[in-house]
């Protein structure tokens, strides 16, 4: 988990309360806490939706779908209860932004959940944390309990008759797969966490069969800030089709790893060299994973690109979940590829044959390759397997495993060939430094 740090280029909107003790409800109230919810109650659902659409906010979990539009898909009238589901199952390797949000500003997540509920007519919200974040559950549960004690949750919230909203917290059991929204609903319903066939989509038939809004934790926590500052003002912080700011967790070989809030469209090069301080020990940049492990890798020559959904797509990769992993010249791409596919093979739910068998065969081939027993046909087979996984699974996990694999093979083929010819450079193992829980809470 990177440290909480700061840089002059940051535009602090969602992170403005970080380091201020805002997990305490009194501290949160001193900083405009729950003010946006009061406004939302007074002005109504149509106003909320208009501001969210004007903000240009796009989903911060990776898909990048416009949030205001997503909320507007929920039918106004439903025979079944409506729900809001916050996806806090942050499990993408290299991603850690939501962790900081839950730790530093849990009430923003609660307030955003309430605002989404008011916008779509839901009376119940669920906040789902990944299994490995179980120690954050105490923080969220205390924040929820404090909100109930203040009359901000439950019946007649803020003293408004008929305005009711409840929040339930839940943790997973450590499966990456349940970060996919339909698998998340299955898990929350007590079933095996595997994806559903769609359509129907969650906005119409979701949790327990009712219309459901599902948003990433960072996405939902932006809602109160947007209502307070105005959707248009928020949009102007970013680019034309990518409104606002975003939390980026910059890790790997940089001088100042940490979670930073940068405007959408900010230069990836500047994020690495200015914000995060560049590559330590005089080493050269080799490659960057720009948005979490599922995003195709960029070489050192490809980092003059803006950090937004559209510019990343033009560069042949994705903004993903905001986890920027920087690799210096000492990193073996073959080893990095093996570590990446090991994760996806382990986390595949096994539901779809292309994902289940494809990840396993790629892992086996890369393992043999890394041990020095590969050949040129293996390189072609790895690419062939990855290409035939693309678009052939119920959920995006198959693509998430295939896309980075294709990037490794296509952009660093010579490095793979060096393993065959015995000319490879010996690289030190990538060291993973564990950070204890007490250090996390105090790392300001």
Segments from the language model and where they lie:
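Cofactor-/ligand-binding subdomain signature composed of acidic, glycine-rich
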Residues: 1-49
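Gly-rich Lys/Arg/Thr-decorated short loops/hinges at beta-loop-alpha junctions or inter-strand turns
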Residues: 28-35, 86-98, 202-207, 249-254
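Ferredoxin-type iron-sulfur electron-transfer modules in oxidoreductases and energy-metabolism complexes
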Residues: 35-54, 80-84, 88, 97-102, ...
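Conserved phosphate/anionic-ligand binding catalytic regions in large, soluble enzymes, centered on
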Residues: 52-74, 116, 174-186, 190-192, ...
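Short acidic, glycine/serine/threonine-rich loops at helix termini
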Residues: 63-64, 68-71, 95-98, 137-142, ...
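Histidine-anchored nucleotide/phosphate-binding helix
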Residues: 105-119
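Short amphipathic, charge-patterned alpha-helical segments
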Residues: 112-116, 263-281
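Hydrophobic alpha-helical positions that pack around
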Residues: 137-264, 276
């Amino acid at each position: 988990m990177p440290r909480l740090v700061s840089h002059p280029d940051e535009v602090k909107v969602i992170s403005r309360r970080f380091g201020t003790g805002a997990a305490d409800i009194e501290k949160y109230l001193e900083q405009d806490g729950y003010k946006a919810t009061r406004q939302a109650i007074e002005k109504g659902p149509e106003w909320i939706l208009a501001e969210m659409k004007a903000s240009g906010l796009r989903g911060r979990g990776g898909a990048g779908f416009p949030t205001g539009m997503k909320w507007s898909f929920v039918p106004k009238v439903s025979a079944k209860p409506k729900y809001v589901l916050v996806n806090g199952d942050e499990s993408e390797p290299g991603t850690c932004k939501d962790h900081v949000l839950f730790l530093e500003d849990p009430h923003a997540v609660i307030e955003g959940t309430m605002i989404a509920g008011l916008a779509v007519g839901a009376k119940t919200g669920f906040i789902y944390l990944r299994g490995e974040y179980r120690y954050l559950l105490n923080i969220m549960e205390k924040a929820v309990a404090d909100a109930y004690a203040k009359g901000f949750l439950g019946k007649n919230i803020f003293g408004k008759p008929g305005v009711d909203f409840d929040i339930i917290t839940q943790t997973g059991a450590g499966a990456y797969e349940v970060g996919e929204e339909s698998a998340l609903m299955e898990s929350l319903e007590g079933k095996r966490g595997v994806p559903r066939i769609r359509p129907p989509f969650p906005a119409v038939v979701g949790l327990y069969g009712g219309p459901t809004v599902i948003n990433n934790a960072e996405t939902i926590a932006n809602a109160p800030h947007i209502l307070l500052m105005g959707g248009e003002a928020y949009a102007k912080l970013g680019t034309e089709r990518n409104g606002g700011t975003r939390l980026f967790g910059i890790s790997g070989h940089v001088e100042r790893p940490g979670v930073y809030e940068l405007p959408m469209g900010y230069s990836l090069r500047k994020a690495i060299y200015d914000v995060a301080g560049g590559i330590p020990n005089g080493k050269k940049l080799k490659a960057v994973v720009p948005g979490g492990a599922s995003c195709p890798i960029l070489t050192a020559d490809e980092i003059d690109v803006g950090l937004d959904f559209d510019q990343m797509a033009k560069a042949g990769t994705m903004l993903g979940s905001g986890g920027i992993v920087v690799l210096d010249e000492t990193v073996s791409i073959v080893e990095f590829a093996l570590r990446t596919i090991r994760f996806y093979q382990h986390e595949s739910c096994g539901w779809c044959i292309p994902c289940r068998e494809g990840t396993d065969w790629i892992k086996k081939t890369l393992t043999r390759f890394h041990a020095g027993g590969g050949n040129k046909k293996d390189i072609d087979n790895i690419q062939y397997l990855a290409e035939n996984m693309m678009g052939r699974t119920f959920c995006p996990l198959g693509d998430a495993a295939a896309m980075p694999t294709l990037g490794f093979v296509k952009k660093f083929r010579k490095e793979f060939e060096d393993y065959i010819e015995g000319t490879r450079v010996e690289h030190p193992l990538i060291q993973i430094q564990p950070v204890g829980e007490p250090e996390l809470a105090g790392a300001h």
